[in-house]
Design a protein with these regions (language model features):
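Short, aromatic/basic amphipathic alpha-helical patches
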Residues: 47-58, 188-198, 266-269
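C-terminal structured domain segments
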Residues: 218-236, 240-243, 254, 258-259
Length: 304
């Protein structure tokens, strides 16, 4: 019998990367067909989802939960017959019902669902060989970062860190008097450029009318419908996020208002693990295989 693992997406991009790495390892270890399901209101839009941006290599996969027979017994049971249920804030209210640990040996259901929150392990040294940008995404990001110098430090100015500790701003200016600026907050960018006019801003910044009560909110977590009403294209925003991630990953030095920002720390870690070059490499051609369930199939790209 074919067995499956659904990896839901929630929270920020680097939470998702960690969870994707976790799910890839589980799928390989337990011989399961993987579906990374990022069809939630934070990431997906206009029929675009995880597989619109990334190719998987070396792990069997399907691209939608609709390719999994819905009648199969599922663990946790909350997802039974409802694999397409969107991840959202409700996950935190039902942690006990969605908890998933593959090492618990008493779970033999054909379908497992990892909720996208909670405990996970990740291996970024392997991840860049298991996940690749789709060719059209790689080409677009390459274009977006082509004119960004690689010899300057990067400064990450996250809107949610506006209330920075005393002296932190001055520390950043001393560490990177001229820098590449990655930010989601227009007010922080304006402040930085006032102090460092020769710095280069690469990010589209947070529109002021999306910032509630003077506090920046991550644009990547803003509902695509809200963004659309503000004239912000979600696909462009996702591309910008990926480009910013690569810019920080490849920088010789990088600094942040909050070094504990997961986007900042994981981009640096990804770069240190040698991921920047390989993730741009085209994935091998996917082969299509039939499953034991009539009318169902999965895909597989052989590792080089």
């Amino acid at each position: 019998m074919d067995r499956y693992l659904v990896g839901k997406g929630w929270e920020g991009f680097c939470d998702r990367l960690q969870c994707a790495s976790h799910c890839i390892d589980i799928a390989l270890h337990y011989n399961r067909i993987l579906c990374i399901d990022w069809t939630d209101r934070i990431w997906s839009h206009d029929d675009r989802h995880f597989y619109s941006y990334f190719d998987l290599v070396g792990v069997p996969y399907v691209t939608t939960v609709g390719q999994i027979p819905q009648q199969l017994e599922t663990f946790p049971i909350l997802w039974q017959g409802d694999l397409g249920r969107l991840a959202d804030e409700w996950l935190y209210d039902r942690k006990g019902e969605i908890a998933f640990d593959a090492t618990e040996r008493n779970h033999h259901q054909p379908v497992w669902v990892y909720p996208g929150i909670g405990n996970r392990y990740y291996d970024f040294i392997k991840l860049h060989s298991q996940m690749r940008f789709r060719p059209e995404i790689a080409a677009e990001i390459t274009r977006m970062i082509a004119d960004v110098p690689t010899n300057l430090p990067v400064v990450h100015l996250r809107g949610t860190d506006r209330a920075l500790p005393d002296g932190r701003w001055e520390e950043l200016l001393r560490a990177a008097p001229v820098a590449i600026v990655v930010s989601d907050d227009s007010a922080l960018v304006a402040r930085w450029l006032a102090d460092s006019p020769d710095s280069m801003v690469v990010s589209e910044t947070l529109a002021p009318n999306l910032a509630g009560n003077g506090v920046g909110i991550g644009t990547h977590k803003t509902d695509p419908l809200v963004l659309k009403n503000q004239g912000v294209d979600k696909h462009r925003l996702n591309l910008r996020l990926l480009a910013d991630f690569i810019i920080m990953a490849r920088a010789p030095h990088a600094h942040a208002i909050n070094p504990n920002s997961l986007f900042f720390s994981m981009s640096r870690f990804f770069g240190q693990c040698g991921g920047v070059g390989p993730i741009f490499q085209a994935a091998p051609k996917a082969e299509k295989f039939s499953t034991h369930h009539r009318g169902h199939h999965f895909y597989f790209r052989q590792s080089p």
